[in-house]
């Protein structure tokens, strides 16, 4: 009886990712943008100017609060308040905005990758995310990254 029970649990856990979770399953929806970006990086790498970047700012309450404020005014419209990619501004985007909250917890994401993503936006991937390198100071981008690591 225990073997059958455990067999059903294992089978179910293997089957659920295939089914997805509604319209936003693992192979479509919010996670898809993260996978598209990851595939692009695996094929092309990222701009060498970003590869070795490391956040120079201290991870403290002041920088987290500043990053949160910047995120809320510049990112939350599309990525949602909690970073799930469910903001009203991103509902009709194809591909939809990335689920940052899940992505940042699933991977050991280097600072340079996050900086590149925010600075260059969707330009390398021809998506709707605007580049922020010309409208934000470096320190502002770093503060957003500090906040994202708290999601």
Give a label for each model feature.
Residues 19-46:
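Extracellular/periplasmic low-complexity linear segments
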Residues 9-17:
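Bacterial N-terminal signal peptides
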Residues 94-151:
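Extracytoplasmic electron-transfer domains, predominantly the class I c-type cytochrome c fold
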Residues 61-84, 114:
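Sequence/structural segment immediately N-terminal to covalent heme-attachment motifs in c-type
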Residues 39-70:
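Electrostatic cytochrome c docking/interface patches
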Residues 1-4:
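Positively charged n-region of N-terminal signal peptides that target proteins for export
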Residues 88-92:
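Short cysteine/histidine-rich zinc-coordinating motifs and their immediately flanking basic loops
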Residues 83-86, 126:
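Short amphipathic alpha-helical interaction/hinge segments
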């Amino acid at each position: 009886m225990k073997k059958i029970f455990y067999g059903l649990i294992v089978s179910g856990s293997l089957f659920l990712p295939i089914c997805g979770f509604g319209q936003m399953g693992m192979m479509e929806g919010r996670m898809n943008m993260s996978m598209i970006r990851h595939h692009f990086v695996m094929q092309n790498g990222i701009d060498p100017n970003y590869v070795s970047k490391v956040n120079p700012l201290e991870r403290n309450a002041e920088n987290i609060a500043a990053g949160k404020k910047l995120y809320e005014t510049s990112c939350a419209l599309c990525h949602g308040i909690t970073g799930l990619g469910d903001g009203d501004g991103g509902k009709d985007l194809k591909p939809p905005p990335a689920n940052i909250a899940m992505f940042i917890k699933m991977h050991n994401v280097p600072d340079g990758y996050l900086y590149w993503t925010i600075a260059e936006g969707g330009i390398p991937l021809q998506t709707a995310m605007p580049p922020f390198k010309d409208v934000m100071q470096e320190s502002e981008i770093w503060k957003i990254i500090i906040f994202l690591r708290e999601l």
